[in-house]
Amino acid sequence: MLKLTPRQAEILAFIKRCLEDNGFPPTRAEIAQELGFKSPNAAEEHLKALARKGAIEMTPGASRGIRIPGLEAKAEEAGLPIIGRVAAGAPILAEQHIEQSCNINPAFFHPQADYLLRVHGMSMKDVGIFDGDLLAVHTCREARNGQIVVARIGDEVTVKRFKREGSKVWLLAENPEFAPIEVDLKEQELVIEGLSVGVIRR
């Protein structure tokens, strides 16, 4: 690893503390707040510099996609973070707020889970995903037709079955009481946050 600047060393120490205390890394916003940066973008630039120097590894597109080589085992022992609630009905505003940690090995799921999302609503009940369940999610940005995804539309997220034809995407409920959500990618942005890889009943 190349020599770090004092500021980079501060950031690395903060990331280590979060991993050791919580089992998951901080967001860019949390780093900015801790270190007194004006915006998360400043934290992002420092993280990129740390990655170039080999001090950390970054997962593109994931708000907590930061790893420190050698500390993965401790993170696994701490389990998976439980992140807020995700609408399995009408979409709700999704702020990635970690409620607590669940003591389960991420490797229990395949592919490996990155976090757990609390489900709110009954739109996916016919595939066994109920209100209050914890959905194990593997972070990725692409999905195939038929997969159950966590999708972001604007600042809101929802859990649905994915279907795409050309520029049209349908997010399908597994409950006849809920209508499909139709998105035209030419007019509206839709982001795949991850794939469902399991459910923990609560």
Curated annotation (Swiss-Prot):
Taxonomy, superkingdom: Bacteria
HAMAP family: LexA
Organism: Pseudomonas putida (strain ATCC 47054 / DSM 6125 / CFBP 8728 / NCIMB 11950 / KT2440)
Listed EC numbers: 3.4.21.88
Free-text function comment from the UniProt entry: Represses a number of genes involved in the response to DNA damage (SOS response), including recA and lexA. In the presence of single-stranded DNA, RecA interacts with LexA causing an autocatalytic cleavage which disrupts the DNA-binding part of LexA, leading to derepression of the SOS regulon and eventually DNA repair.
Catalysed reaction equations from the record: Hydrolysis of Ala-|-Gly bond in repressor LexA
Gene: lexA1
Name of the molecule in the record: LexA repressor 1
Pfam families, A to Z: LexA_DNA_bind, Peptidase_S24
DNA-binding region, residue intervals: 28-48
Quaternary structure (record): Homodimer.
Residues annotated as the enzyme's active site: S123, K160
GO BP terms: DNA repair; DNA replication; negative regulation of DNA-templated transcription; proteolysis; SOS response
Protein family per UniProt: Belongs to the peptidase S24 family.
Top EC class, one word: hydrolase
One Gene Ontology term of the molecular function aspect: serine-type endopeptidase activity
